[in-house]
Amino acid sequence: MNIADYKGGVWVFAEQXDG
């Protein structure tokens, strides 16, 4: 499951729920 979160103007892709 690939989740893309927009943080600080940067797309952060979390595939393993890291962070």
Curated annotation (Swiss-Prot):
Provide the cofactor list for this protein. Answer: FAD
Q: Where are the transmembrane segments?
A: none
Keywords attached to this Swiss-Prot or TrEMBL record, sorted alphabetically, are: Electron transport, FAD, Flavoprotein, Transport
Q: How is the cofactor bound?
A: Binds 1 FAD per dimer.
* Family membership noted in the UniProt record: Belongs to the ETF alpha-subunit/FixB family.
Subunit and partners: Heterodimer of an alpha and a beta subunit.
The free-text function statement in the UniProt record for this protein reads:
The electron transfer flavoprotein serves as a specific electron acceptor for other dehydrogenases. It transfers the electrons to the main respiratory chain via ETF-ubiquinone oxidoreductase (ETF dehydrogenase).
Record's protein name:
Electron transfer flavoprotein subunit alpha
Source organism of the structure: Clostridium pasteurianum
Kindly list the organism's lineage: Bacteria, Bacillati, Bacillota, Clostridia, Eubacteriales
Q: Which gene encodes it?
A: etfA
